[in-house]
């Protein structure tokens, strides 16, 4: 029947997670939260968190952070946009926090990463 809820159907679960991931990929620059996404897809926070991790292989915050950092690297490759502006463009209001997340994920801060790209001719 077409009335199965997201918790009752494996296909529906995969579909809502796929839709949520696509939404994040598109709106990564918005202030996305677990509670906001859970509300959007009409599920409890704990359920959203559990099935997102199961289907995507990483938790929501890591997925969102990775998506934002990948987008930031893309902007770095496109030109000389100010790093604080790039941080804002990918959804970070606080450059210090962006720097911390970037460093944690990439092993170096955004400034060093950009310098390494220039040295490598990227």
Where are these regions (language model features)?
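Short, Lys/Arg-enriched, Trp-marked, Pro/Gly-tolerant hinge/linker segments that flank
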Residues: 1-19, 26, 35, 40-41, ...
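Terminal helix-turn-helix DNA-binding modules in bacterial transcription factors
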Residues: 21-22, 26, 31, 54-93, ...
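Residues within helix-turn-helix
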Residues: 35, 46, 82-85, 95-96, ...
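Residues within the alpha-helical elements of helix-turn-helix
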Residues: 40, 89-90, 105
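Short hydrophobic/aromatic patch on the recognition helix
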Residues: 47-48, 52, 97-98, 102
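…primarily DNA-binding HTH/wHTH and HhH modules…
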Residues: 100-122
């Amino acid at each position: 029947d077409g009335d199965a809820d997201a918790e009752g159907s494996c296909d529906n679960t995969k579909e809502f997670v796929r839709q949520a991931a696509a939404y994040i990929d598109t709106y990564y620059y918005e202030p996305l939260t677990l509670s906001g996404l859970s509300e959007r897809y009409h599920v409890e926070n704990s359920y959203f968190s559990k099935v997102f991790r199961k289907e995507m292989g990483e938790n929501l915050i890591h997925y969102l952070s990775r998506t934002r950092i990948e987008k930031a690297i893309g902007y770095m490759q496109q030109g000389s946009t100010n790093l604080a502006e790039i941080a804002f463009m990918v959804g970070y209001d606080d450059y210090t926090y962006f720097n911390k997340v970037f460093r944690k994920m990439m092993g170096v801060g955004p400034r060093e990463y950009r310098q390494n790209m220039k040295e490598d001719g990227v």
